[in-house]
């Protein structure tokens, strides 16, 4: 198996991927993005790199013998005027700015194009860990009740529509009312906003109501930016009074699956995977 270069942003996903590769005996190195990557990744071979340091990243990947790369983790859209790119990054910067004006997906595709031009193959996180995506059906012991089905349906519709508009990947619906949609703030911040809403229009621990739906954008570069949930998502959804989470089977990453199942079961939330081509 070819050596993997993990381009690591923030969050738990890069940490789990590194642990998986280590346990599976797959050779890998980690390119740790400054200000984003988890400090626990420092123990692995690789390099600390900045977002605009394309030359340093390519040099480090080749020095480590990597010919396949996987992008994982959260990275905020940069302030291009404040970037400090290296010489290689300076050549790429104008095209990145143009792509960014077209949306996040166009920006990601432009970054991938640059890596592929350098001869690196792109491998998605779900390809590195095949068992990482949400399966079809219930994940854990809790099932949605009949009264949740309409919210599941509408939340998925809203999530898919904002994805079509390249706005975000998530939406929260409670008893037919759209409580929130995700944009640049991300899912965690969206759920915090829901938790701050009056209990009269959302659920609570004693009577859970409402659904978080996450869905990829129709034109999304799935090798890089599949929607993701983890243990923190479960806890924030619970604090917001939600009844559960729904996503498209095979198109939602579940980070630390066993811990997600345990947290959802303990808090009484359902996690449901639906066929991307069907309504639940």
Swiss-Prot record:
Needed cofactors, names only, are: Mg(2+)
Q: How does activity depend on pH?
A: Optimum pH is 7-9. The activity is relatively constant between pH 6.5 and 9 but declines sharply below pH 6.
Gene Ontology biological process = lipid A biosynthetic process
Keyword Membrane part of the UniProt annotation: yes
- Residues the entry annotates as binding substrate: 12, 74-75, 169, 187-188, 214, 226-233
**Subcellular locations according to the entry:** Cell inner membrane
- Which key words are in the record? Cell inner membrane, Cell membrane, Hydrolase, Lipid A biosynthesis, Lipid biosynthesis, Lipid metabolism, Magnesium, Membrane
User: In Gene Ontology terms, what is one molecular function of this protein?
Assistant: UDP-2,3-diacylglucosamine hydrolase activity
Specify the protein's topology with respect to the membrane: Peripheral membrane protein
For this protein, what does the record note about how its cofactor is bound? Answer: To a lesser extent, can also use Mn(2+) or Co(2+).
Query: What biological function has been recorded for the protein in this entry?
Result: Hydrolyzes the pyrophosphate bond of UDP-2,3-diacylglucosamine to form 2,3-diacylglucosamine 1-phosphate (lipid X) and UMP by catalyzing the attack of water at the beta-P atom. Involved in the biosynthesis of lipid A, a phosphorylated glycolipid that anchors the lipopolysaccharide to the outer membrane of the cell. Can functionally complement lpxH deficiency in E.coli. Cannot use CDP-diacylglycerol as substrate.
* Binding partners and assembly: Homodimer.
- What's the entry's take on its domains? Consists of two domains: an N-terminal lipid X binding domain (LXD) attached by a flexible linker to a C-terminal catalytic domain (ICD). Binding of UDP-2,3-diacylglucosamine by LpxI induces a conformational switch that brings the catalytic domain close to the lipid-binding domain for specific recognition of the substrate and catalysis.
The entry's protein name is UDP-2,3-diacylglucosamine pyrophosphatase LpxI
Q: What is the lineage of its organism?
A: Bacteria, Pseudomonadati, Pseudomonadota, Alphaproteobacteria, Caulobacterales
């Amino acid at each position: 198996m070819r050596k993997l270069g993990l381009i690591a942003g923030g969050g738990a996903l890069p940490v789990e991927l590194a642990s998986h590769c280590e346990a599976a005996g797959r050779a890998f190195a980690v390119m740790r993005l400054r200000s984003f990557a988890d400090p626990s990744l420092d123990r692995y071979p690789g390099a600390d790199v900045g977002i605009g340091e394309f030359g340093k990243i390519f040099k480090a990947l080749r020095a480590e013998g990597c010919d396949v790369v996987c992008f994982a983790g959260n990275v905020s859209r940069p302030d291009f005027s404040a970037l400090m790119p290296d010489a290689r990054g300076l050549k790429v910067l104008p095209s990145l700015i143009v792509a960014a004006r077209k949306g996040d997906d166009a920006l990601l595709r432009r970054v991938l194009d640059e890596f592929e031009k350098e001869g690196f193959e792109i491998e998605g996180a779900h390809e590195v860990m095949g068992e990482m995506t949400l399966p079809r059906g219930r994940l854990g012991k809790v099932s949605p009740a009949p009264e949740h089905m309409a919210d599941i349906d509408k939340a998925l519709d809203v999530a898919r529509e904002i994805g079509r508009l390249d706005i975000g990947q998530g939406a929260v619906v409670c008893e037919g009312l759209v409580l929130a949609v995700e944009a640049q703030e991300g899912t965690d911040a969206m759920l915090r906003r829901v938790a701050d809403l009056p209990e009269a229009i959302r659920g609570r621990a004693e009577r859970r109501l409402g659904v978080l739906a996450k869905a990829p954008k129709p034109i999304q570069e799935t090798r890089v930016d599949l929607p993701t949930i983890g243990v923190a998502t479960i806890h924030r959804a619970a604090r917001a009074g939600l009844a559960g989470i729904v996503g498209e089977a095979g198109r939602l990453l579940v980070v630390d699956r066993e811990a997600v199942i345990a947290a959802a079961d303990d808090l009484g939330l359902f996690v449901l995977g639906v066929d991307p081509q069907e309504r639940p």
